């Protein structure tokens, strides 16, 4: 498959990120590497979406702190960003709602075809720009080669990086604004783009807990969007999926990353990180990046069991 016929993917991870760990970042990297190796996908971006404060989880520190820690954790990444939309809503949002928000938003700001897993575009190729006279923001006068889908969407991201949402005292975060004026950005209507939910096997297993998830939401998440699962602690994902009728029904929409099952980051968790911080355990440097640790110590977070 050529670059233009592959499905372009944005990986979206929802969660508490309380705090965000090296394991979370490695989850993105492992998922991207795995999808690229299949030869069917090009991952063009990753989104970290921390949960709203009203989620009510014990020990959950405020979104103000969690957003800043997430931003510090991805500051050196050229493809993963933090999106505060979920935190800035009036109340907690379901995972399904967050996925739908980003799907609808990307439709508006990129002009791309965003396909459901079960209804892929029949012509996943780059179309013609609507405005052939405008100077595209991706154009390099010294390199007049044809732009690729990934380059186009990458430059859309650069344009949007100037659009920030500011809510004092939270620092500035770049995110996609549905009211953004993209200026001379060319819109290509026939790039097949999907937003996939990225998660660990623990979230997948939670789908099997009766009453925890709304079944209609599960149908949309797994049936329409699709999931990329990065197993933790050598979890048996086949066994997990067999315990849910919806997961069995849409098993072809669930991609399990099969790389090194003994990956050192697969055992890292936010819970272990909080415990290490509370006990002064030096192993915390194995779990969290140094900028995140520095911020936690400066802000005196997770000092006691209540967060």
UniProtKB/Swiss-Prot annotation:
The gene is NMNAT2. Belongs to the eukaryotic NMN adenylyltransferase family. Divalent metal cations. Mg(2+) confers the highest activity. This is Nicotinamide/nicotinic acid mononucleotide adenylyltransferase 2. It comes from Bos taurus (Bovine). Inhibited by P1-(adenosine-5')-P3-(nicotinamide-riboside-5')-triphosphate (Np3AD) and P1-(adenosine-5')-P4-(nicotinamide-riboside-5')-tetraphosphate (Np4AD). GO terms for biological process: NAD biosynthetic process. Pathway: Cofactor biosynthesis; NAD(+) biosynthesis; NAD(+) from nicotinamide D-ribonucleotide: step 1/1; Cofactor biosynthesis; NAD(+) biosynthesis; deamido-NAD(+) from nicotinate D-ribonucleotide: step 1/1. Degraded in response to injured neurite. Degradation is caused by polyubiquitination by MYCBP2 after recognition by FBXO45.
């Amino acid at each position: 498959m050529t670059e233009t016929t592959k499905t372009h993917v944005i990986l979206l991870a929802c969660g508490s990120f309380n705090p965000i760990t090296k394991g979370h970042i490695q989850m993105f990297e492992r998922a991207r590497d795995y999808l690229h190796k299949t030869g069917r996908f090009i991952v063009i971006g990753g989104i970290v979406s921390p949960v709203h404060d009203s989620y009510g989880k014990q020990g959950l520190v405020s979104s103000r702190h969690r957003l800043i820690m997430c931003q510090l954790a991805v500051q050196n990444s050229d493809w993963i960003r933090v999106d505060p939309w979920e935190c800035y809503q009036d109340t907690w949002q379901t995972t399904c709602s967050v996925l739908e928000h980003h799907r609808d938003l990307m439709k508006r700001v990129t002009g791309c075809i965003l396909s459901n897993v079960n209804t892929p575009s029949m012509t996943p190729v780059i179309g013609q720009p609507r405005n052939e006279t405008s100077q595209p923001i991706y154009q390099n006068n010294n390199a007049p080669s044809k732009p690729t889908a990934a380059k186009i969407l990458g430059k859309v991201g650069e344009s949007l990086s100037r659009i920030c949402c500011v809510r004092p005292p939270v620092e500035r975060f770049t995110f996609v604004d549905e009211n953004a004026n993209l200026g001379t950005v060319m819109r290509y209507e026939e790039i097949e783009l999907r937003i996939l939910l990225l998660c660990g096997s623990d979230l997948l297993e939670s789908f099997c807990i009766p009453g925890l998830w709304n079944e209609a939401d599960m149908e949309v998440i797994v049936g329409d969007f699709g999931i990329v699962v990065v197993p933790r602690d050598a979890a048996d994902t086949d066994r997990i999926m067999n315990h849910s009728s919806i997961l069995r029904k849409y098993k072809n929409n669930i991609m399990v990353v099969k790389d090194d099952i003994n990956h050192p980051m697969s055992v890292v968790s936010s819970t272990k990180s909080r415990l290490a911080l509370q006990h002064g355990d030096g192993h915390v440097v194995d779990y969290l990046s140094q900028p995140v640790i520095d911020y936690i110590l400066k802000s005196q977070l997770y000092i006691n069991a209540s967060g």
